[in-house]
C-alpha cells in the first residue's frame, strides 16, 4: 500500500522556510532531518596552496577560514568528488572578503560576498589557490548545506473555558506552528484550519486567546520542519535532494533484500 503524504509551506524563502508534512512517523521525520544535514552534498574548500602570506595569521588559520566559506552548488552539473579551483589575491591595507575569491567555474562561487577572511595592514599581502571539493556533511561538517534543520509537532489549541477573575494571567508560551481550531475566540481575523506561526502573537497564547483557558495538543503524524541553508542552494532544493537520498537508499535496501 502506498502511503500518501501532504506537504505544505508555512513560510517559504530562499534560505529559510517552514514546511508542514502530514502522514509521517517521528522516525521518518528524524530521517528527513538527518538527510538534510548529512546527505546533501555541497562544495567546500578542502586544499589550500599558500603562495604568499605576510599577514599576522598562520597559513593553517587562513585555510580553516576559507574552508568555512559557503559556496554555491549546482547538484545537476556536478558529482561527489568533483573539484573546482579558486584563487584569492589581496594587498593591504584592505580586508579580504569572500567576494575576493575568484572561481574557475562561475557556477561555484561564494554564497555571500561580505564574509571577512582577514584584515590586512599596510605592506601585507595574501595570495592563495584553493581546491573546493563536492562532498557531504557525513564526511565533514563544512559540507552541511542545511545549517539549521529541526522539526516539531504541529499543534492544536482548544479553548476549554474562560479565565476566572482571580486566575493567574502569566504568559502562556508556545513556540512553533498551530493549526487554528478556535477561530471564534482568537484575537483579530482568524479562520479555522489556517496555519499560524506562534511568533505572530509573540509566542504567547494569552495574546492569541485573551481571557481564555486553553489546552494544547499535538496533531498526530504532522510535523513542521524549520529549514535554514548556508546559501549553497535554496531550501526547496535541500528538501527535495534529502528526500531523494532517502528514496535511493530505500530502493537499494529493497533490491538487496530481494537478491
Curated annotation (Swiss-Prot):
> Where does the record say this protein resides?
Cytoplasm
Q: Which SMART domains match?
A: RPOLD
What keywords tag this UniProt record?
A: Cytoplasm, DNA-directed RNA polymerase, Nucleotidyltransferase, Transcription, Transferase
Q: Which family does it belong to?
A: Belongs to the archaeal Rpo3/eukaryotic RPB3 RNA polymerase subunit family.
Organism for this UniProt entry:
Haloarcula marismortui (strain ATCC 43049 / DSM 3752 / JCM 8966 / VKM B-1809)
The catalytic activity, as recorded, is: RNA(n) + a ribonucleoside 5'-triphosphate = RNA(n+1) + diphosphate
Query: Which GO terms fall under molecular function for this chain's record?
Result: DNA binding; DNA-directed RNA polymerase activity; protein dimerization activity
What are its GO cellular component terms? cytoplasm; DNA-directed RNA polymerase complex
Q: Which domain of life does the UniProt lineage start with?
A: Archaea
Q: What is its main location?
A: cytoplasm
> Cross-referenced PANTHER family, in alphabetical order?
DNA-DIRECTED RNA POLYMERASE, DNA-DIRECTED RNA POLYMERASE II SUBUNIT RPB3
**Entry EC no(s):** 2.7.7.6
Pfam families recorded: RNA_pol_A_bac, RNA_pol_L
Q: What is this protein called?
A: DNA-directed RNA polymerase subunit Rpo3
Biological function: DNA-dependent RNA polymerase (RNAP) catalyzes the transcription of DNA into RNA using the four ribonucleoside triphosphates as substrates.
Q: What GO terms describe the biological role, i.e. biological process, of this protein?
A: DNA-templated transcription
Q: What class of enzyme is it?
A: transferase
Provide the assembly information: Part of the RNA polymerase complex.
Amino acid at each position: 500500500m502506498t502511503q500518501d503524504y501532504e506537504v505544505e509551506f508555512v513560510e517559504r524563502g530562499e534560505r529559510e522556510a517552514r514546511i508542514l508534512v502530514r502522514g509521517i512517523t517521528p522516525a521518518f521525520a528524524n530521517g528527513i532531518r538527518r538527510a538534510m544535514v548529512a546527505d546533501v552534498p555541497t562544495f567546500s574548500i578542502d586544499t589550500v596552496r599558500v603562495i604568499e602570506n605576510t599577514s599576522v595569521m598562520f597559513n593553517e588559520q587562513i585555510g580553516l577560514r576559507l574552508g568555512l566559506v559557503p559556496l554555491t552548488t549546482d547538484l545537476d552539473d556536478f558529482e561527489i568528488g568533483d573539484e573546482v579551483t579558486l584563487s584569492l589575491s589581496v594587498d593591504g591595507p584592505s580586508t579580504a572578503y569572500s567576494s575576493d575569491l575568484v572561481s574557475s567555474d562561475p557556477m561555484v562561487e561564494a554564497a555571500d560576498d561580505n564574509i571577512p577572511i582577514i584584515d590586512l595592514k599596510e605592506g601585507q599581502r595574501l595570495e592563495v589557490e584553493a581546491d573546493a571539493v563536492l562532498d557531504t556533511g557525513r564526511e565533514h561538517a563544512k559540507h552541511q548545506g542545511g545549517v539549521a534543520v529541526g522539526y516539531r509537532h504541529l499543534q492544536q489549541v482548544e479553548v476549554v473555558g474562560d479565565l476566572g477573575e482571580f486566575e493567574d494571567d502569566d504568559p502562556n508560551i508556545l513556540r512553533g506552528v498551530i493549526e487554528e481550531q478556535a477561530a471564534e475566540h482568537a484575537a483579530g481575523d482568524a479562520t479555522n484550519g489556517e496555519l499560524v506561526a506562534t511568533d505572530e502573537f509573540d509566542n504567547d497564547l494569552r495574546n492569541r486567546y485573551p481571557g481564555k483557558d486553553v489546552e494544547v495538543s499535538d496533531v498526530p503524524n504532522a510535523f513542521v520542519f524549520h529549514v535554514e541553508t548556508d546559501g549553497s542552494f535554496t531550501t526547496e532544493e535541500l528538501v527535495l535532494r534529502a528526500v531523494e537520498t532517502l528514496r535511493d537508499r530505500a530502493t537499494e535496501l529493497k533490491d538487496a533484500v530481494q537478491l
